[in-house]
């Protein structure tokens, strides 16, 4: 589909359906636990079975996460926002930023007002006015989005100074990735 080879994709999809080998799994989160790679939903799976590094900060997090995700390294590899935008609304309609934040797709100021927090001494001084609306928007999207992606102003379990640390993904200017930002 991404390459816009729709006829070829439709043929492949038809083969998957008519094979009767695959079906949607009841619990999305269970797909990512041991045994999930053998579920009826998995067509191609790479299972993370743990035991490498820390349970809260596997090697991929080390290379792609923030300092809080693993306790060191960098945070310059992120999922493309265009990919995140492909997650539909729960009702199956396409997601559109303009429905939530008019002017978002054309104005950097609107994007700034929507996402930018202000920090003081590595603490959030002021959240963006739109924080609650963002969280509401996430709730109304396909739940697989928030199960798969750390979204701005959501909480996640990180790893700092050899212990679990609960973190919030905050967007701000003039900071580095130390202490969760």
Question: Model features per residue range: what roles?
Answer:
Residues 2-174:
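An aromatic- and glycine-enriched ligand-binding surface/loop that stacks and positions planar moieties
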Residues 175-181:
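Long, K/E/R/D-enriched contiguous segments that form extended
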